[in-house]
Curated annotation (Swiss-Prot):
Its EC number is 5.5.1.6. One of its GO terms (biological process) is flavonoid biosynthetic process. Pfam families: Chalcone. Catalyzes the intramolecular cyclization of bicyclic chalcones into tricyclic (S)-flavanones. Responsible for the isomerization of 4,2',4',6'-tetrahydroxychalcone (also termed chalcone) into naringenin. The record marks Y108 as: Important for catalytic activity. The gene is CHI. Keywords: Flavonoid biosynthesis, Isomerase. This is Chalcone--flavanone isomerase. Expressed in leaves, flowers and fruits. Belongs to the chalcone isomerase family. It comes from Citrus sinensis (Sweet orange). One of its GO terms (molecular function) is chalcone isomerase activity. The lineage of its organism: Eukaryota, Viridiplantae, Streptophyta, Embryophyta, Tracheophyta. Part of the biosynthetic pathway for all classes of flavonoids, a large class of secondary plant metabolites, many of which are brightly colored.
Length: 222
């Protein structure tokens, strides 16, 4: 096990993302890789809906370093392959999505489901198994309401996605549902930071912070 990388907290609007967490359903420590808002242009104005924090298991840095150390933040930001390696890498990830504006569970899950299906169709891997996983995913959210400050939490483990909810910023120990689907688990994160990810700000933040951490790792290995 590698020591936790030394990182700072991040603020997105009035949401604070702590430097490290132990996600629901995991026994491992995760550090804050990056964070940013998700918003849409509405009538000429950028409206922010959620703040997204992406955490990575501590082992992620040495696992990514072999291929990506020495790259600048700009190079990582522009690299589709880098973000695919983050999404598909053999380490846990944790995503905390905190509401800036209120959303219903149906509004949130339907948009995520739509993005996941688009990703699978792009890769040519949308089958009945994925359709069933999406059904389970939307079912978990159907009766939920998320006021500002409440959070949706995703723990991405190899082969499964643990979903949790928090109304007060705390991190629960266990999830409300576990969906056994590696492709769904990866697609949820891909929809945030992938090629057409919904949060360019979180992607940029992740690239900047990981570039610095990977270069520290590179210096230590010299």
């Amino acid at each position: 096990m590698n020591p936790s990388p030394s990182v700072t907290e991040l603020q997105v609007e009035n949401v604070t993302f702590t430097p490290s967490v132990q996600p629901p359903g995991s026994t491992k420590s995760h550090f804050l890789g990056g964070a940013g808002e998700r918003g849409l242009e509405i009538e000429g104005k950028f409206v922010k809906f959620t703040a997204i924090g992406v955490y990575l298991e501590d082992d992620a840095v040495p696992l990514l370093a072999g291929k990506w150390k020495g790259k600048t933040a700009e190079e990582l930001t522009e690299s589709v392959e880098f973000f695919r390696d983050v999404v598909t890498g053999p380490f846990e990830k944790f995503m905390k999505v905190t509401m800036i504006l209120p959303l219903t569970g149906a509004q949130y899950s339907e948009k995520v489901a739509e993005n996941c299906i688009a990703i699978w169709k792009f890769f040519g891997i949308y089958t009945d198994a994925e359709a069933k996983a999406i059904e389970k995913f939307t079912e978990v959210f159907k009766d939920e309401i998320f006021p500002p400050g409440s959070s949706i939490l995703f723990t991405q483990s190899p082969g499964s996605l643990t979903i949790s909810f928090s109304k007060d910023g705390s991190i629960p120990k266990d999830g409300v549902a576990v969906i056994e689907s590696n492709l769904l688990s990866e697609a949820v994160l891909e929809s945030m930071i992938g090629k057409n990810g919904v949060s360019p700000a979180a992607k940029k933040s992740l690239a900047e912070r990981l570039s610095a951490l990977l270069n520290v790792t590179s210096d230590k290995m010299k």
